[in-house]
Regions:
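A short glycine-rich, Lys/Arg-flanked "PGG" loop and its adjoining helix->strand segment in the class I
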Residues: 32-48
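Conserved Class I S-adenosyl-L-methionine
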Residues: 100-147
Length: 147
C-alpha cells in the first residue's frame, strides 16, 4: 500500500499497470482535469484504474435529508455525488476510456462491514445509517482503461 498526496505522486512515468482507489476518489477526483493531469502519466498504455466511490442515489443540491446530517455536515456531503455525476467526470478524460460505472452489487455488505469497524469515522457514521441514510447512499464502482 502507498500513502501519498494524490496531487504529487512519487512515481516514474508509465510505472503502473493498474491502480485501485477505494473510498477516496470523491475527495480529489471531482476536477475533470485531475485524471488526465495527475494520474495518467503514471499509468501504462492499456493500464486500468479501478475505483470504489461513496455515492448518492441522487443529487440533493444542498437540501439533504435530516438523517444524512446526523453524521456529516453539508460541506462533507458535497463530496458525495451520484452515478451520473461520476460518469460525466470520468468519461470526459482524453486519456482513458470509461469501461464501466455503476452501483456496486455488494453495496449493503460494504456498508455493514464498514459500520462494524471501531474507528471514529465508522462509529460516527452509525447514527445516520441507523436513521435511514442507507436509502440515499450507495457505493459506485468504475473501471477505466488508458488509451
Amino acid at each position: 500500500a502507498v500513502k501519498a498526496d494524490a496531487e504529487s505522486l512519487p512515481f516514474d512515468k508509465d510505472f503502473f499497470d493498474a491502480i485501485t482507489c477505494i473510498d477516496s476518489w470523491n475527495y480529489f477526483g471531482r476536477d475533470k482535469a485531475f485524471l488526465d493531469n495527475k494520474i495518467s502519466p503514471f499509468i501504462k498504455k492499456g493500464g486500468k484504474i479501478y475505483l470504489a466511490i461513496t455515492g448518492m442515489e441522487k443529487e440533493f443540491n444542498g437540501e439533504y435529508p435530516e438523517c444524512l446530517l446526523l453524521s456529516w455536515n453539508k460541506e462533507q456531503l458535497e463530496y458525495i455525488k451520484d452515478i451520473e455525476y461520476w460518469r460525466d467526470v470520468l468519461s470526459s478524460s482524453k486519456d482513458f476510456e470509461l469501461l464501466e460505472c455503476r452501483r456496486m452489487e455488494t453495496d449493503d455488505e460494504a456498508w455493514n462491514d464498514w459500520l462494524k469497524e471501531e474507528n471514529e469515522y465508522a462509529i460516527g457514521d452509525r447514527k445516520s445509517m441507523e436513521s435511514g441514510a442507507g436509502d440515499y447512499l450507495c457505493f459506485i464502482m468504475a473501471v477505466l482503461e488508458k488509451k
